[in-house]
């Protein structure tokens, strides 16, 4: 399922126009993104948690030259599925 499919599903299930559903989906994504950018955790009970995790600095290797390089520490978004979502997928 891609974003267009998601918008169509939301429009059908919530009895909205595709434009309204698109605005709702965009608002949800933007809210999650803004919260993560502030370092906040987003908890959606039954669905899962979005959070920012620290990735440690590490050594890597350039695949073209084989030369070792330093990869700096970074922050990455992460998602952990909730129990209801895990059970639905089983």
Curated annotation (Swiss-Prot):
Recorded superkingdom: Bacteria
Signal peptide as annotated in the record: none
UniProtKB keywords: DNA condensation, DNA-binding
UniProt-listed InterPro entries: Hist_DNA-bd (IPR000119), Histone-like_DNA-bd_CS (IPR020816), IHF-like_DNA-bd_dom_sf (IPR010992)
GO annotation, cellular component aspect: cytosol
Alphabetical list of SMART domains matching this protein: BHL
Gene3D superfamilies: IHF-like DNA-binding proteins (4.10.520.10)
Keyword Cell wall biogenesis/degradation among UniProt keywords: no
Matches recorded under PROSITE patterns: HISTONE_LIKE
Cross-referenced SUPFAM superfamilies: IHF-like DNA-binding proteins (SSF47729)
Function: Histone-like DNA-binding protein which is capable of wrapping DNA to stabilize it, and thus to prevent its denaturation under extreme environmental conditions.
Quaternary structure note: Homodimer.
Protein name, entry field: DNA-binding protein HU
Gene expressing this chain: hup
């Amino acid at each position: 399922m891609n974003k267009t499919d998601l918008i169509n599903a939301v429009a059908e299930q919530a009895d909205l126009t595709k434009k309204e559903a698109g605005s709702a989906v965009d608002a949800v994504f933007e809210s999650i993104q803004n919260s993560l950018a502030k370092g906040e955790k987003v908890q959606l009970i039954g669905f899962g948690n979005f959070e920012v995790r620290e990735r440690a600095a590490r050594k890597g290797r350039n695949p073209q030259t084989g030369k070792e390089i330093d990869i700096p520490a970074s922050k990455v978004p992460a998602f952990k599925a909730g129990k209801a979502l895990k059970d639905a997928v089983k």
